[in-house]
């Protein structure tokens, strides 16, 4: 891809990170050299990816080229959404308030809580027996 008339955004969520390049086009979304429908089997993940574009009504106006790595399906979808949002803001700064109101600009800082010593999981204690 050439650097002319394209915008870039980096998105992160959980342990996933996505690099999003947008340029004027017909609405084609390519993730890791695969179509959106092929890459994400679940409709919910596809919906999450499309949310910022649908909000600003640019679904058919921009082509997206995305590389994403790390994490699982949900984290990758969230990272892509965050990256698309940042790329859209670079493309047109006037979209920021609309995207901010929808909550797409803020990076979701929630992470998996670590497992503690003496517990079964992060917070799950071993079963207590009185006798």
Curated annotation (Swiss-Prot):
A GO molecular function assigned to this protein is: RNA binding
Q: Give the UniProt entry's GO cellular component terms.
A: cytosolic small ribosomal subunit
Record keyword Ribonucleoprotein present: yes
Pfam assignment, any one: Ribosomal_S9
* Assigned keywords, A-Z: Ribonucleoprotein, Ribosomal protein
Instruction: Please give the biological process terms from Gene Ontology that the record holds.
Output: translation
Q: Which domain of life is it from?
A: Bacteria
Where exactly are the transmembrane stretches of this chain?
Answer: none
Q: Look up keyword Transcription and say if it applies.
A: no
The family line of this record is: Belongs to the universal ribosomal protein uS9 family.
NCBIfam families per record: PRK00132.1
What name appears for this protein in its UniProt entry? Small ribosomal subunit protein uS9
Identify the species of origin.
Answer: Mannheimia succiniciproducens (strain KCTC 0769BP / MBEL55E)
């Amino acid at each position: 891809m050439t650097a002319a008339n394209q915008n870039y955004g980096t998105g992160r969520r959980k342990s996933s990170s996505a690099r999003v390049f947008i340029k004027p086009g017909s609405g084609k979304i390519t993730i890791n050299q695969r179509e959106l429908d092929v890459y994400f089997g679940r409709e919910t993940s596809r919906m999450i990816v499309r949310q910022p574009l649908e909000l600003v009504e640019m679904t058919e106006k921009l082509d997206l080229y995305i590389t994403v790595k790390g994490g699982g399906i949900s984290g990758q979808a969230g990272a892509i959404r965050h990256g698309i949002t940042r790329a859209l803001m670079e493309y047109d700064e006037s979209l920021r308030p609309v995207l901010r109101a929808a909550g797409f600009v803020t990076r979701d800082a929630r992470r998996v809580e670590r497992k503690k010593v003496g517990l079964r999981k992060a917070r799950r204690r071993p079963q207590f027996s009185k006798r």
